[in-house]
């Protein structure tokens, strides 16, 4: 996404539609972000300027990419927010980030992605800071988002339960190195790398312990 500080060293290529994103200027990357590449962050509170109401962020983003009027932006966002179960869109847009729950902020980011219609959505640990009920609801919204838009999604997560529910293919990394890549079914049923087997076995052990506890209650 080109959001790292200039002094952070990066190497390699990131190819998107035949173009190396690492070679683009900030001005060129700014055009890609939002329209082509959209990122949904782990902490919704950090995704929005705390000194501005939510609507300011949404209007600035959509006006920059589409040149829409405030009225058109409100209409577009109202429809998108209702589709992710957020009612009273105008009221929400007039609130500050700290006045909304983590789950609501995640849904606002998903609604914004619906309006932007990017080619790729990068979701970085989007359910980590949420309670179990909010996690379930947000994952369902991600699945609907992918189905509705037909876009590609890179979903970064340590939660294998969420990964199993939302992913088609899994890429396992350890210390920044790719150690295994395969379909969801193969990774969970026949993991090849020792580290992947460790992750999957721990997940199964937790699930079995939970089932045993529930059976005793």
Task: Identify what each model region corresponds to.
Residues 87-93, 181-217:
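Short catalytic/signature loops enriched in Gly
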Residues 9-20:
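Conserved ABC transporter NBD signature motif
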Residues 163-165:
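A short, surface-exposed alpha-helical micro-motif characterized by mixed small hydrophobic
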Residues 136-149, 161:
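Helical segment within the ABC ATPase nucleotide-binding domain
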């Amino acid at each position: 996404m080109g959001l790292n500080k200039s002094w952070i060293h990066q190497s390699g290529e990131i190819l998107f539609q035949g173009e190396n994103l690492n070679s683009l200027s900030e001005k060129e990357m700014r055009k890609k972000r939002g329209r082509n590449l959209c990122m949904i962050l782990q902490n919704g509170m950090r995704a929005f300027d705390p000194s501005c109401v939510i609507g300011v962020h949404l209007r600035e983003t959509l006006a920059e990419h589409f040149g829409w009027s405030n009225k058109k932006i409100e209409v577009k966002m109202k429809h998108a927010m209702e589709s992710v179960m957020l009612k009273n869109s105008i009221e929400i847009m007039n609130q500050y980030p700290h006045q909304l729950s983590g789950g609501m902020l995640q849904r606002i980011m998903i609604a914004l992605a619906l309006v932007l219609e990017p080619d790729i959505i990068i979701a970085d640990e989007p359910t980590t800071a949420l309670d179990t009920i909010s996690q379930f609801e947000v994952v369902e919204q991600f699945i609907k988002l992918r189905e509705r838009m037909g876009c590609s999604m890179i979903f970064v997560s340590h939660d294998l339960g969420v990964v199993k529910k939302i992913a088609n293919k899994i890429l396992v990394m350890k210390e920044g190195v790719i150690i295994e890549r395969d379909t969801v079914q193969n990774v969970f049923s026949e993991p090849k790398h020792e580290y992947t087997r460790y992750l999957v076995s721990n997940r199964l052990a937790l699930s079995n312990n939970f089932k045993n506890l529930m059976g005793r209650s």
